[in-house]
Amino acid sequence: MQNRPKSVLTPARLGTSGVVRNTLEDPWVRFQIELEFVQSLGNPDYLTFLAQQGCFDKPEFINYLSYLQYWKSPSYSRFITYPFCLHMLDLLQSPDFRREVAHESVTRFIDDQMLLHWKNYLRKRAEMVNKHVQSLDAMATPGPGPSS
């Protein structure tokens, strides 16, 4: 039998005293859990589920969403794979948005907007980069010098 390294995703790990400790006390596990949760906020269907379950009516949950704002800082946001989740985290700070996201029509609208963004992003970005390069080329091209 091989000795495999213990995974960081095990439900519980041993503390320095050999006693099993709560996984939320482990900073690495907590980091992973919070990262996964923040990224799940980019899923409009999940937001609708949370709203329909009444999570957005609980002050503790609202405070947790506020606490998670630290993920917007560059030292943490560099770990984010789906940056749209940070925009959704911002929107979730609004009571109006939390109330409206419970409706399927709002979820479909958000889904549609995300798909349109993904569909057109690369083309629009390429156009913007080309315009920028052209403007840099125009600035770098020296004009006629003084006449002698």
Swiss-Prot record:
Give Gene Ontology CC terms: mediator complex
Q: Which Pfam families match?
A: Med31 (PF05669)
Q: Does the keyword Transcription apply?
A: yes
Q: Where are the transmembrane segments?
A: none
Q: Which UniProt keywords apply?
A: Activator, Nucleus, Transcription, Transcription regulation
Gene Ontology molecular function terms on file: transcription coregulator activity
Q: Where in the cell is it found?
A: Nucleus
Q: Which GO terms describe its biological process?
A: regulation of DNA-templated transcription
Describe its assembly.
Answer: Component of the Mediator complex.
What does the sequence similarity comment in the record state about its family?
Belongs to the Mediator complex subunit 31 family.
Function, as annotated, reads:
Component of the Mediator complex, a coactivator involved in the regulated transcription of nearly all RNA polymerase II-dependent genes. Mediator functions as a bridge to convey information from gene-specific regulatory proteins to the basal RNA polymerase II transcription machinery. Mediator is recruited to promoters by direct interactions with regulatory proteins and serves as a scaffold for the assembly of a functional preinitiation complex with RNA polymerase II and the general transcription factors.
Q: What is this protein called?
A: Mediator of RNA polymerase II transcription subunit 31
Identify the species of origin: Taenia solium (Pork tapeworm)
